[in-house]
């Protein structure tokens, strides 16, 4: 009980601290956490709830923070993230979802940001990008795809932009350009090809 006489915790105790299965409440009486405890900290499997009683997180806890496999929700049972957690942050393999439940991203995370290899999806369900990420942005080798699933670009990205060596493809899959890029623009040494992928121009681009 709090000083005001409202219930703040109900469940098992050991050495005067929450231990085992128990429920934590907000001051207004709304349930905040339901699950396992160890030495006064959320530890094991549990659920957290928002001020309106909506489910916010369901999964593993360690020393009071989400840890291991878990699911994060937004709104009324709308799944936002599903995957690995470490010390309260998205860390490891995971999936992000659009509000309608369709997959938005599948890949690696570090400290809540996309980091490592991952796939980004359109709302239609087709893959938009597959490749390397750093600090939440496309960074390193990667491939862009058009809505038909054909490769549109393959090359190097820097901070979310095409930058470095890269190849651009037509919608029919044939190679159009191969060469250097700078911040999304063809820049430097490059070559243009016709639909039969025969060289038609080579030189500098600005």
Task: Give the label of every model feature segment.
Residues 1-3, 23-27, 47-51, 71-75, ...:
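Beta-turn initiation residues at beta-strand->coil junctions
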Residues 8-18, 32-43, 56-66, 80-91, ...:
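Conserved anchor residues at repeat-unit boundaries in beta-strand-based tandem repeats, strongest
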């Amino acid at each position: 009980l709090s000083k005001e006489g409202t219930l703040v915790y109900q469940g098992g105790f050991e050495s005067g601290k929450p231990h085992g299965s128990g429920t934590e409440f907000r001051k207004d009486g709304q349930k905040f956490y339901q699950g396992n405890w160890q030495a006064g900290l959320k530890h094991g499997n549990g659920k957290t709830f928002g001020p309106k009683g909506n489910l916010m997180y369901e999964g593993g806890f360690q020393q009071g923070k989400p840890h291991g496999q878990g699911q994060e929700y937004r709104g009324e049972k709308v799944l936002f993230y599903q995957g690995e957690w470490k010390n309260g942050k998205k860390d490891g393999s995971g999936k992000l979802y659009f509000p309608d439940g369709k997959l938005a991203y599948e890949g690696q995370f570090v400290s809540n940001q996309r980091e490592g290899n991952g796939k980004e999806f359109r709302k239609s369900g087709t893959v938009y990008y597959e490749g390397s990420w750093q600090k939440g942005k496309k960074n390193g080798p990667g491939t862009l795809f058009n809505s038909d699933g054909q490769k549109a670009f393959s090359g190097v990205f820097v901070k979310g932009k095409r930058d470095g060596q890269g190849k651009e493809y037509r919608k029919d899959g044939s190679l159009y350009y191969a060469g250097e890029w700078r911040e999304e623009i063809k820049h430097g040494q490059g070559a243009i090809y016709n639909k039969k992928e025969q060289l038609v121009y080579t030189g500098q681009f600005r």
